[in-house]
């Protein structure tokens, strides 16, 4: 599980930062990629990475401001032109379906793959045997959501060596033991499957704030997260601007990470007013003063989400 930041700027593209998009690479887990937001030229950014558009399985949109959605029509079309056939699912606020349908219809873009669009509300928006994704409303002046991606715990590996030492040969019984079931062998022995499993691997958690003011809602969304990706449009000294424009500061994002018990904070959605090495170092220092394990994201930065 890796995060790849495709765009880390705020509002409009800049020379060093494109507008918002983050890829959650789940290549080992499910051979796919999930995108969180898709600002203008996201597909251009993807060209500079190893991501294949046909591997993009899901796109989660936080809100409908242009710097988070203008990249969708182009990416959807290119995915089709490049021979993508795998289904793609998009999640987002009310209006996302009309935006996509209108864009595709007006431009006569025909997709070669199934596209499903879910207009979401708070709560669970996706769940399968591997992951659960929940959405929470955040404070941004328009309908906006943050997302929490929680990997389910992975059952412990079967201790096949111990079973063989006990003269239990491989076969269908191994599957039952692997499920933790209690089984009775042909010779009358009773085996508790849980006694032959390694400890389970704890699932990882990644939270995305989307654009938002500092909020207890985000704190809960990021509770015990391995990585919190939080917007930090403004510096500490510009807290009034952040409030007026429904954004957060570096310090506020760090306070959220600390209260949530997150393990790592990645700051993104950085205003173009802070350009150059020195201003960015200052922003990072402001966050680190509150939450040490903080880092300012830059375009194409990759972060491995480690297991606890």
Swiss-Prot record:
Its EC number is 3.1.26.11. It comes from the Bacteria. Keywords: Endonuclease, Hydrolase, Metal-binding, Nuclease, tRNA processing, Zinc. Binds 2 Zn(2+) ions. It catalyses: Endonucleolytic cleavage of RNA, removing extra 3' nucleotides from tRNA precursor, generating 3' termini of tRNAs. A 3'-hydroxy group is left at the tRNA terminus and a 5'-phosphoryl group is left at the trailer molecule. The active site is at residue 67. The keyword tRNA processing applies. It holds the Pfam family Lactamase_B_2. SUPFAM superfamilies: Metallo-hydrolase/oxidoreductase. GO terms for molecular function: 3'-tRNA processing endoribonuclease activity; zinc ion binding. Zn(2+) 1 binds at residues 63, 65, 140, 211. Its cofactor is Zn(2+). The keyword Zinc applies. It is an enzyme of class 3 (hydrolase). Zn(2+) 2 binds at residues 67-68, 211, 269. NCBIfam families: PRK00055.1-3, RNase_Z. Homodimer. HAMAP family: RNase_Z_BN. Belongs to the RNase Z family. Zinc phosphodiesterase, which displays some tRNA 3'-processing endonuclease activity. Probably involved in tRNA maturation, by removing a 3'-trailer from precursor tRNA. This is Ribonuclease Z. The gene is rnz.
């Amino acid at each position: 599980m890796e995060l790849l930041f495709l765009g880390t700027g705020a509002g409009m593209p800049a020379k060093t930062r494109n507008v918002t998009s983050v890829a959650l690479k789940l290549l080992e887990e499910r051979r796919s990629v999930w995108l969180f937001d898709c600002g203008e030229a996201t597909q251009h950014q993807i060209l500079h990475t190893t991501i294949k558009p046909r591997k993009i399985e899901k796109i989660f949109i936080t809100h409908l401001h242009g710097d988070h959605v203008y990249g969708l029509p182009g990416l959807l079309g290119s995915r089709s032109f490049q021979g993508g056939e795998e289904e793609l699912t998009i999640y987002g606020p009310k209006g996302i379906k009309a935006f996509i349908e209108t864009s595709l219809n007006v431009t006569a873009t025909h997709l070669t793959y199934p596209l499903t669009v879910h207009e979401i509300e708070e709560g669970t928006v996706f769940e399968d045997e591997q992951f659960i994704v929940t959405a929470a409303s955040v404070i941004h002046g328009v309908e906006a959501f943050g997302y929490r991606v929680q990997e389910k715990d992975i059952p412990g590996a079967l201790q096949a060596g111990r079973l063989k030492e006990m003269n239990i040969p491989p076969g269908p019984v191994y599957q039952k033991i692997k499920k933790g079931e209690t089984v009775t062998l042909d010779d009358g022995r009773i085996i508790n499957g849980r006694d032959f499993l390694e400890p389970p691997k704890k699932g990882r958690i990644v939270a995305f704030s989307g654009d938002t003011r500092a909020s207890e809602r985000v704190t809960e969304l990021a509770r015990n997260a391995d990585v919190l990706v939080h917007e930090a449009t403004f510096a500490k000294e510009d807290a009034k601007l952040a409030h007026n424009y429904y954004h957060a500061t570096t310090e506020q994002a760090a306070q959220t990470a600390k209260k949530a018990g997150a393990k790592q904070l990645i700051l993104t959605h950085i205003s173009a007013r802070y350009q150059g090495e020195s201003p960015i170092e200052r922003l990072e220092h402001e966050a680190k003063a509150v939450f040490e394990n903080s880092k300012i994201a830059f375009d194409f930065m990759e972060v491995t989400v480690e297991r606890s």
